[in-house]
Amino acid sequence: MPLSSRGFSAQLWALVGATFLGFLGIGTVLPMLAPHIRYDLKGTDQDVGLVIGIFSFVALAGRLISGPLADRRGRKISFLTGLGCCGLAGAIYLLPIGMAGPYLARIFQGMGEAFLYTGAASWVVEIAGVQRSGQALGYLSSGIWGGISAGPVLGQWVGTFARAAALQMLLAAVAFLVLTQVKEVYHPVPHHGPRTWLPPGILGPGIAIGFVNVQYPVIAGFLILHLKAHGNSGPAAFSAYAGTILLSRFFLGGLPDRIAPAITFFGGLSCMAVGLLLLASGPSPTLAIIAGGILGFGFSFPWTAVVSTVIRRTHSSKRGSSVGVLTAFYDLFVGVSSFTAGAVAHQWGYGAAFVMAALALVAAAIAGRYVFFGQAEVELPRVAATLPGR
């Protein structure tokens, strides 16, 4: 399916739509999961924490498996595997096996999310062409954030955990069927020599991505609690944060393709720092909403700037592995910073956790210097010539 000079093909939009459905299903179960464990299964608060947390560790392992699979067998098989795991997770939730159900389901959920995103991200870049990788990844991220944002609302609407789990299974099945109709043209390049877990040059970009995302568990865990004493503006500020990310990645995701990615990366970090420090100060409701929007706007750019830069330097036979490792850094840093933010907030208050996230951006900027100014895009001409639509 060729790609016109005026826009992206229906093939790419089908991938974005399937991604949206997959993440919509993931988000549908989330608001019901903790009450289901505590009240339906008579679990403890510790069970809730372990069930929620096991996802990140499984996803981390899944990134390292899904990348090589996407490179060797194709992007589609990774994507389909992810959707299949998400559907199985929904089915497992419905099994009458007690507390084993949520644990097992979250294992499949983490693996499914890892395979889904690795396959989708690698595939949309193949379709769009490396020169428009930033815009393609921006559209894909919009599908993810749209699903994550709408999922909890849908879950609350269906009313019960069993219905939410069944809906997750149904949405994954629909996305799976949609994806089977999308033709993939991918010919793996034979690889000579041993494969490594860390593709060359990936450490700097991974560290940059990791420190950028230290803010995410701070926002998810402490924004509402922190702002409760400052006009109770947490829900509105979070909506401004998430909504701005969704809109910015959809409409402005192509900026790293049109201007130097370093500009969008460091500009994004600057906006994030402003937003985090404003939130740390305990602002008024109006200023808190503005700060949430500024933070979300800034957060919209570093990921696409780094990933599109890495993709331009990476041969098509290694792109799946590179995307998988980059997202593994995300999982690692989010997991570690979740515990760190909790300890900081306990010791010095919620505002200190936001300051910690702002300081992490300094480390992200240092790593970014090596990402954007320390390596040339040596493989771009050779790679671009092999991509469809070029």
What do these predicted ranges mean?
Residues 105-143, 308-309:
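Cytoplasmic helix-loop-helix junction between adjacent transmembrane helices
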Residues 62-74, 159, 248-261, 345:
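Helix-to-loop junctions at the C-terminal end of transmembrane segments
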Residues 77-91, 263-278:
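Structural signature of the two symmetry-related core transmembrane helices
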Residues 42, 74, 95-98, 260, ...:
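Helix-breaking motifs and short loop linkers at transmembrane-helix boundaries and internal kinks
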Residues 169-188, 367-372:
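C-terminal membrane-cytosol helix-exit motif in multi-pass small-molecule transporters
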Residues 61-97, 256:
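Conserved MFS/SLC helix-loop-helix module at the cytosolic interface between two early adjacent transmembrane helices
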Residues 56-64, 148-149, 242-250, 334-335:
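Residue-level signature of mid-helix packing/kink "hotspots" within the transmembrane helices
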Residues 30-31, 204-238:
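Extracytoplasmic gate region of multi-pass secondary transporters
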